[in-house]
């Protein structure tokens, strides 16, 4: 089975696609081979849409199996496409790149530390999980500095012990550090995963792949 992937030659697949357990939101122009790899590795239903007229879906969408948090600048037809599968919350204001600022699964959500209380309460209501403010390796865009599934959470290799402890206090899932695409700590930029499987950016090394498999509980070979 394919374990590494590129989006139009770009290894940062997490910027262009958002997996919400049983669905994957992908740009309409994604290639047939790219879409086939997602379906084979992750067993997902594909939701083909832009967000804000853009293909950087992973940066603009977050969520879990209950709900989706989408940039407040998304167009009505884009919102409707996602609403067929999830309750949608629009993330308004200057901090609207939901995929960058929210790390979520079905147990928890971690958000940019400067996010306001009212928005956090909305996220809690839509996703149905406790929400914490967090940095990872001091990085506020936790949605790209980590990747959460219902099997485990992979975070930036230089995450501090206190950051890991805060995250571990919200979940009973394994939390581990790692890198993607030959040394990038921004693991969310180059990873797509769910309870079924995972795909990493095409530049990801064998060692990095092994770490991903370990944190998410997949046995290689």
UniProtKB/Swiss-Prot annotation:
Pfam family, one: eIF-6
InterPro entries: eIF6
Record flagged with keyword Protein biosynthesis: yes
GO molecular function terms noted in the UniProt entry: ribosome binding; translation initiation factor activity
Domain of life: Archaea
GO biological process, one term: cytosolic ribosome assembly
Keywords of the record: Initiation factor, Protein biosynthesis
HAMAP family linked: eIF_6
Role noted for this protein: Binds to the 50S ribosomal subunit and prevents its association with the 30S ribosomal subunit to form the 70S initiation complex.
Entry similarity comment: Belongs to the eIF-6 family.
Record protein name field: Translation initiation factor 6
Protein species of origin: Methanosphaerula palustris (strain ATCC BAA-1556 / DSM 19958 / E1-9c)
């Amino acid at each position: 089975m394919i374990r590494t992937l590129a989006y139009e030659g770009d290894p940062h697949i997490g910027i262009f696609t958002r997996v919400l357990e049983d669905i994957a939101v992908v740009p309409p122009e994604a290639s047939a081979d790219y879409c086939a790899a997602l379906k084979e590795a992750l067993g997902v239903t594909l939701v083909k849409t832009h967000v804000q007229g853009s293909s950087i879906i992973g940066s603009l969408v977050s969520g879990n199996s209950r709900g989706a948090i989408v940039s407040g600048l998304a167009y009505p037809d884009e919102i409707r496409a996602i609403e067929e599968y999830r309750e949608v919350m629009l993330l308004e204001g200057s901090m609207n790149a939901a995929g960058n600022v929210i790390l979520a699964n079905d147990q928890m959500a971690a958000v940019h530390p400067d996010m306001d209380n009212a928005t956090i309460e909305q996220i809690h209501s839509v996703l149905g999980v406790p929400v914490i403010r967090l940095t990872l390796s001091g990085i506020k865009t936790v949605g790209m500095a980590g990747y959460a599934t219902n099997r485990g959470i992979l975070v930036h290799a230089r995450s501090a012990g206190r950051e890991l402890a805060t995250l571990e206090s919200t979940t009973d899932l394994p939390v581990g550090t790692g890198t993607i695409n030959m040394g990038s700590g921004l693991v969310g930029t180059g990873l797509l995963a769910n309870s079924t499987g995972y795909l990493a950016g095409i530049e990801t090394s064998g060692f990095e792949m092994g770490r991903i498999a370990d944190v998410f509980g997949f046995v290689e070979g």
